[in-house]
């Protein structure tokens, strides 16, 4: 979606983003791969998704109309641009094609908007990339002859070339990957209260990982996410064992799991993360990654997995030095 006062960079946004999402190489950057390939790699070939792209379309107003913050610090009416985008494709798209579970509702609708996002260099009047549901906005769930739309997500087109730079480049696929992952049911792994909970840092695309490689090389999903999605079966360790030749995540290695025998909702996950494949931009961090999980369902439902306002963090890296922070990353 373009705005009345902001258009996409370049003169071929459709083909650029079709390449980024579907065909393997970003036209302007020759980076790692497409979002389609990302999900193929994460799911061991199970989740083979193609992205149908429509547009660009132009919104009725300038970007500030949709992105301006309210008194609570959040965007006031970003849902309006979703409504306008859906109006632009009405009658051109069969929404039932995107209804994966047969409930009459398109499961994911994603909007890419022109310019910067508030989370990565844009000012307060730009839209913050997010996933949400239209039932929370004044428009409510939208109904069309071929189906309903409720869940949507959005992300920005551009980012600063370097921190604080006024030179802007394509935002890559990292933020799209993160927000689309919310559509699939994955929760944030950073401290959603804005506190000092350290979460999963660069090792998780639901934390800082979508920004790896300047957004062009989002890291692999963690063992928790791949297990949660049903894409990998962990190997249980229930007695002392010697593990050799542990394959890396990028080489489709299976993670190991060790349960608390008194509470199977608490466990440790172990996986080999090497600077290869989608993990090649882990800033030199490689080796055995151990994650401590305290599975409290409400923390995932409320998107507060690693909130510092809670007594414990529920899915965090176990540091080799025993510290409770990763400020050196």
What does each of the following model-derived ranges do?
Residues 13-16, 220-227, 287, 305-309:
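Short intrinsically disordered coil segments
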Residues 32, 36, 108-110, 114-285, ...:
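Extracellular hydrolytic enzyme modules, especially secreted metalloproteases
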């Amino acid at each position: 979606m373009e705005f009345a006062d902001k258009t996409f960079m370049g003169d071929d946004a459709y083909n650029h983003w079709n390449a980024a999402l579907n065909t393997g190489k970003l036209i302007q950057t020759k980076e790692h791969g497409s979002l389609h390939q990302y999900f193929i790699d994460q799911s061991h070939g199970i989740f083979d998704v193609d992205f149908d792209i429509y547009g660009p379309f132009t919104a009725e107003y300038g970007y500030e109309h949709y992105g301006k913050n309210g008194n609570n610090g959040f965007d006031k009416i970003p849902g309006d641009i979703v409504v306008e985008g859906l109006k632009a494709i009405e009658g051109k798209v069969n929404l039932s094609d995107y209804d994966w579970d047969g409930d009459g509702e398109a499961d994911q609708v994603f909007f890419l908007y022109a310019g910067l996002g508030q989370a990565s260099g844009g000012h307060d009047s730009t839209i913050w990339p997010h996933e949400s549901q239209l039932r929370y906005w004044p428009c409510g769930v939208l109904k069309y002859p071929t189906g309903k739309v409720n869940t949507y997500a959005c992300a920005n087109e551009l980012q600063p070339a370097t921190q604080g730079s006024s030179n802007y480049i394509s935002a890559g696929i990292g933020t799209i990957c993160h927000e689309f992952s919310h559509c699939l049911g994955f929760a944030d792994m950073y401290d959603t209260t804005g506190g000092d909970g350290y979460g999963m840092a660069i090792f998780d695309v639901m934390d800082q990982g979508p920004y790896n490689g300047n957004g062009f090389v989002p890291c692999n999903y963690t063992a928790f996410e791949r297990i949660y999605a049903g894409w990998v079966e962990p190997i249980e360790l229930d007695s002392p064992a010697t593990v050799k030749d542990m394959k890396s995540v990028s080489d489709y290695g299976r993670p190991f799991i060790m349960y608390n025998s008194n509470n199977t909702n608490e466990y440790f996950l172990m996986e080999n993360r090497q600077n290869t494949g989608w993990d090649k931009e882990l800033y030199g961090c490689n080796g055995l990654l151990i994650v401590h999980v305290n599975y409290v369902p409400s923390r995932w439902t409320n998107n507060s997995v690693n909130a510092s306002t809670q007594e414990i963090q529920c899915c965090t890296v176990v540091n080799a030095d025993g510290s409770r922070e990763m400020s050196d990353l």
